[in-house]
């Protein structure tokens, strides 16, 4: 990459291809396009310098260009080493927006790119974060913690990725002037977080009194978690497995670990493809839901020798262990649709015999001769082996992200360093923006009907405690 180019992409020559797909995606993302039209004139994000860490896909390109249209300056990385769509990254780079994303990054490259989010091209710093999984947010928090003198954690990494991340922090402490991380933390006015795992990290920081800036939990907007997490996974999971393996799904036995929104969508995806689906759960409520949906609810220990396909969707660690994989059928397919790669004990497989079949598809042989097929090295299968969720469902998620960025940027000082959610009025607005595209005719309450149930005829239609 020439030094005067403020981007890193696989091939800038893919920009035209990416631009064509972005144009198609825009027609499938009515919420984002409506927000772009509504706010472009007022430029509510003027002055915002957004450091974005979110899968660099075609759909994300539409989000980026919406933020740009509303006045923001932007730098972007992908939040997963396998999720970048290279033609999307090329199109964004060609449009003059700094992006550092390549499908198949090394972990070292991933964290180096993340660091470049915070070195603004004019020598300044970002003042907003748009995050997915929390890595950009963790970069700021870990750096400031070490800068303040608490460095012991940097010498005790718990994984290969932490080893690389902590080495980066050590290097930056040497390279940057003293107080650089403190200045960065002070500069950030807020973060909007996309996914369950990242939100979990934020709530822990807030509970411990360590959150450095206000955060909006986009994940728990109804129009995100009940649509992206559920309906998105329902379409994209099987797409990833099929592209990775070309296996016949019908008739296979599949095991889904976790029956939250992502697990529900995953189980439905497999069932719709003709699989006989089992589910494991720790939560009795979710376990009962799965059973009432007709799934066999059992343990991973019971399912390991029986299933042909395994999917983790828990947000927890070590859900599929080495012992589970030892007892699986020959060439059982193992994959993950949770944000991080530690749901499957991939690190424990490193000393076994690996055969790469094709990008993001590996066959791993155990000493007894039986093999498993591991997709995307235990990272997000729907983005590593396929193209992620469809544009329409991502429009709802990214409309929430845009509204969250506007809320935080235009109301500086309003929020404490806690985690907030968007109001139900905005949730309903996001849903309403997507109805016309799919031909929905919404019923309007008469004044007497609205009064009867104690709501405004224009909404909100449900109390905050309502569970959709």
Swiss-Prot record:
One of its GO terms (molecular function) is adenosylhomocysteinase activity. It is an enzyme of class 3 (hydrolase). Pfam families: AdoHcyase, AdoHcyase_NAD. Pathway: Amino-acid biosynthesis; L-homocysteine biosynthesis; L-homocysteine from S-adenosyl-L-homocysteine: step 1/1. Keywords: Cytoplasm, Hydrolase, NAD, One-carbon metabolism. May play a key role in the regulation of the intracellular concentration of adenosylhomocysteine. Substrate binds at residues 57, 132, 194, 224, 228. This is Adenosylhomocysteinase. Its EC number is 3.13.2.1.
